[in-house]
Regions:
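An N-terminal, well-structured beta->alpha segment
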Residues: 1-2
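Glycine-rich phosphate-binding loops that contact phosphosugars or nucleotide phosphates
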Residues: 6-137
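Internal, active-site/partner-interface "lid" segment
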Residues: 94, 108, 135-165
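Short, solvent-exposed beta-strand edge segments and adjacent coil->beta transition regions
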Residues: 167-170
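The conserved cystathionine-beta-synthase
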Residues: 172-181
Length: 181
């Protein structure tokens, strides 16, 4: 909440999808945020990550090779890194200004290898972080409508006063007027 710039998320694979979701959630309540895919970063997209921004990198292993160029870019420009991993000795956490160490969990399923439990835990962590940020910035329904005017949520938040025509904008005709004219 003290970030002077944008909150940028990155991650590869399932971690990237969680980062994209977390970014979308933050944007929906007014925190400027977006997702940069790590494979696009070394091809020009790293230019969207600026000195005042905060870069949140998510990687269960913390050693995902595709993230190295993003870490290097952040280090080169003095961009703060918040690293989220389940590996205390990871490259990611070694290069992070703020370290989020999530517990290692056993993946459910027949192989025990498909990211299921770990992705659920990571998504839950970032949803809880979003709720804490909403509380810190005193987020309310009246602020939510400013960023989320569409869909079912937007319809639920709109008031009649926001959508009804008023005053001389009302299409009024005299009751004696001919309908065909």
């Amino acid at each position: 909440a003290n970030c002077k710039g944008k909150v940028i998320f990155t991650g590869q694979g399932k971690s990237g999808k969680i980062g994209a979701s977390a970014s979308s959630t933050m944007s929906s309540f007014g925190i400027p945020s977006f997702f940069v895919h790590p494979s696009d970063a070394p091809h020009g997209d790293s230019g969207s990550i600026q000195r005042k921004d905060v870069l949140i990198i998510i990687s269960y292993s913390g050693n995902t090779p595709e993230l190295q160029s993003v870490i290097s870019h952040a280090n080169r420009f003095g961009i703060k890194i918040i690293g989220c991993s389940s590996n205390k000795a990871s490259t990611l956490l070694k290069h992070s200004d703020v370290k989020i160490l999530l517990p290692k969990v056993r993946e459910v399923g027949p192989t025990g290898m498909v990211p299921t439990s770990s992705t659920t835990l990571t998504l839950l962590y970032f949803n809880c972080l979003a709720v804490a940020l909403m509380d810190k910035i005193k987020f309310s329904k009246s602020k939510f409508i400013l960023f989320h005017s569409g869909g079912s949520i937007g319809k639920e938040l709109l008031t009649c006063g926001q959508i009804c025509l008023k005053g001389n904008k009302l299409p009024l005709i005299n009751y004696k007027s001919n309908i065909l004219k």
